Amino acid sequence: RNRSGSVLEVGVGTGLSLPDYKRELEIVGIDLSTEMLEKARQRVTELGLTNVKGLYEMDAGELEFPDHSFDTVVAMYVMTVVPDPEKVMRELSRVTKPGGEVVLVNHFSQEEGVRGWVERRMAPFAELIGWRPIFDHSRVMVCDDLKLVERKSVRPFGIFTMMRFQKLAEAKRIAAE
């Protein structure tokens, strides 16, 4: 995408995606894992990623940033592993600037078909490792000030979905209420 400005990556992990961002973007990453963040810092240093402005240990449900801090907020493979995805979604919206975007990549469960059957059978095993295979997309549709503008299947095998939301400007949000 032709994004510009500042990006918050929630659940940055070891920083595997950091080299993929355009160098013009200012990147901040957060994760709960100190060990993962250390690996991300090493990656930033080794690759000379001067556009990465900070990597912080932080809870996605209690972001320590002021309102409207970022042009884009990205959360890849995060929503099914956090204890309160609705709270996290509200926090992502809060720190996104009006007119900015929230981008999620996540697994969302399938109601029907072979995939739905497999997901229901695998759920008890997946939950043992902290993953929710039965996760409806409605759990991220909780913010009145976020408008879904794109939804599509992504690799591998189309089992993940990218959802792109636009943060409504204050005037638009009030008019929509």
What are these regions (language model features)?
Residues 72-84:
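A short SAM/SAH-binding and catalytic strip from SAM-dependent methyltransferases
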Residues 6, 26, 99-101:
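Short glycine-centered segments of the SAM/dcSAM-binding site in methyltransferase folds
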Residues 58-73:
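A short acidic, Gly/Pro-enriched loop at the edge of an enzyme's catalytic core
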Residues 86-98:
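A short glycine-rich, Lys/Arg-flanked "PGG" loop and its adjoining helix->strand segment in the class I
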Residues 8-62:
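Class I SAM-dependent methyltransferase SAM/SAH-binding core
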